Design a protein with these regions (language model features):
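Conserved eukaryotic protein kinase-like
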Residues: 2-294
Length: 294
């Protein structure tokens, strides 16, 4: 495993003008464009199941061996070509395997676009399950099970390898659920593999502006610094979403309630948090359990 991470660090340090992606078949399978087209019924609109970062379209597909997959179409469909961020995700996921991370099955790299073939998560994102259209309220025990699974995935990223991995975009729409309600972290395009010498310290983000998702970003993002606790901050916002049953920002609410973090902090300071949580959960959470969660 160690030599694979070393090769990944070399990839980040390279300055190649044309994206390259050469991976051993035993680590990551490379599909042909014909196989991808066949799996998605030639990218039929009925196969679209969502979008990912930077407007990438995600299709549900069936490979030639019958495996149901999610196929993310990156680059050419939006006119931007294949970016280093998209290559970054494939390179990184080839190094990571954990029950609470969405698994990479393979990829297809053409001249202008790339297709990332991922494990299919039949129940969609945590955001969809919590407050999506026609959602069914989840029991508190069920929500805790989902949170614990996602926390285990995040803990693996931070401590399960020689070099810490910072996800950099933890949010409820990047946590997915399979048929058995197992939660798994996805979307690693913005992730950072920290050099060994800085694995427990801050690292600078190599951009001219903060990247991530507004409302989930830790304060250090403002000065383009990143650490493992940045992910923990973002995950804390997700935990509030789970408790309140709403997104981190909702413009339809009164101004003082629009930003979830601010509203949660205010409710905690006033001792009214129990009255602010998801209506469905009221009377269904033991006070000692709620206090421990908070």
């Amino acid at each position: 495993m160690r030599h694979r991470f070393c090769s990944l660090l070399s990839f980040f340090a390279s300055k190649k003008k044309s994206p390259q992606l050469e991976l051993p078949e035993d680590i990551c399978r490379q599909f042909s464009l014909a196989q991808i087209k066949a799996a998605t019924n030639n990218f039929h609109p009925d196969s679209i199941i969502g979008t990912s970062y930077f407007g990438s379209i995600v299709y549900k597909g069936t490979m030639d061996d019958g495996t149901i997959v999610a196929v993310r179409r990156c680059g050419g469909s939006s006119g931007g070509g294949v970016s280093e961020l998209q290559l970054n995700e494939v390179k990184l996921l080839c190094q990571l395997r954990h029950p609470h991370l969405v698994s990479l099955i393979g990829f297809c790299l053409s001249e202008k676009e790339m297709f990332v073939v991922l494990e299919y998560m039949s129940r969609g994102s945590l955001a969809h399950v919590l407050y999506g259209k026609d959602h069914v309220p989840l029991a508190w025990k069920h929500r805790l099970h989902i949170c614990i699974g996602a926390a285990r995935g995040l803990h693996y990223l931070h401590t399960g390898a020689k070099h810490a991995v910072i996800h950099h975009n933890i949010k409820s729409s990047n946590i997915f659920l399979d048929e058995e309600w197992c939660s798994k972290i996805s979307d690693f395009g913005l992730s950072k593999l920290l050099p060994l010498s800085t694995s427990k310290a801050l690292t600078r983000i190599d951009t001219d502006h903060a990247v991530g998702t507004c409302g989930y970003m830790a304060p250090e993002h403002r000065v383009r610094l990143l650490k493992e606790k940045s992910d923990v901050f973002s995950f804390g916002i997700v935990l509030y979403e789970v408790l309140f049953g709403r997104p981190q920002y909702d413009s339809t609410l009164p101004e003082e309630k629009q930003y979830l973090l601010d509203w949660a902090m205010e409710s905690l300071s006033q001792g009214t948090i129990y009255h602010a949580i998801d209506q469905y959960l009221k009377g269904r959470i033991a006070p000692e359990c709620l206090n421990k969660y908070l």
